[in-house]
Amino acid sequence: MRIRRRLPIVLAVLLVAAAVALAVILRKHAPPEPARLLPAADGFVYVNLGWMRRANIAGELPAVPHDPDYEQFIQATGFQFERDLDEAALAIHYPANSPDAGLNSARQPRFSEVFVGKIDGERLRAYLRQLASSVDNFETREIYNIPLEGRTVRVAILGVDTVAASNLDDPLVIRGIIGRSRKLASPFGGPALLRQYYKEVPFASLGWAVFKVQPSPAAEPIGWSFLFSKPATVVASVRYLGAVHFKAQAITGGGDEASQLSDRIGNFLNVFSSAESTVSAPGPDPDIKALFDSLKIQPEKNRAVLTATVPPGLIRKVLAEAPLSVTPETAAPPVTPVPSQSGGKADKNKKKTQN
């Protein structure tokens, strides 16, 4: 009798344990939550900057000089991207496939983003209200409509650490992100392209990208027609295992396409490597040479698989030298609403001093 009484309890415990284990496994193979909140798109990019900082991939870097507009943003919100941003997920809408594509935007891609980090909500709301031409309310969330370069960027604070934005004309896009953020996170959720191909992303990847490739030069932001003769899907990822390991798979329609694509990519890399060795003086950078030496491209069934190992020293050099190439742009005429406001205040101060 005791065995019969205990049997249902044991079965119930086993069922609960199996359900929990299944949920954990599904969550491991599901895209990160910021990516699952994104709308349907032609490409997706995700970066886990929090893990990258903890892994100290780039090491100690010199101080980065800030653009005046960015410095104003930091002072107003207290948020510094290189310090406070933990996760970023980006959806890329190709021009031909954007729901709001028109004659004026035929060659311009559109983007939707979800950011996770250390956010001061009150300061960020105050900053967004200053920039917004209007504020909408949807499901208790405020949507800030910010005019920028002839378009409207819609921004919404989803939670204590999450912000979403989109520059698509359709207001339903940002509302869809808000609606998904208020539902219980499901490992089965997310855009169809991610649900289909995220399983190809290696486990513990710090960053990855999944995007469609069309041979037409006007189909996406980057023209791939010199490599791809037919449509394909690319899955790229980055992992850190003492060094940065990069892997990109171009999933094609068959084995012949994969072989031809591998040959074209291999020839392109050989030409690029030869050109780099020729222009480098007095000799090629050892980190760049190590990168090119590690490059491998080979067909695997219906895929062309490219792998490479990026030395940490090369990453440090790129990040350390990047500010030098952007600092001259700080003198360019401001085009965003932020500098126009600061410029207006400066003009008023000048008039006061003259009086």
Which ranges hold each PLM region?
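An internal, short helix-loop-strand segment that often contains or flanks glycine-aspartate motifs
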Residues: 56, 60-85, 134-243, 257-258, ...
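Short, conserved charged micro-motifs
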Residues: 54-56, 120-126, 255-262
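N-terminal Sec-pathway targeting helices
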Residues: 1-16
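N-terminal, charge-rich interaction modules
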Residues: 34-38, 46-50, 54
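Single conserved position on a long alpha-helix in the C-terminal lobe of the eukaryotic protein kinase
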Residues: 45, 81-189, 248, 306-326
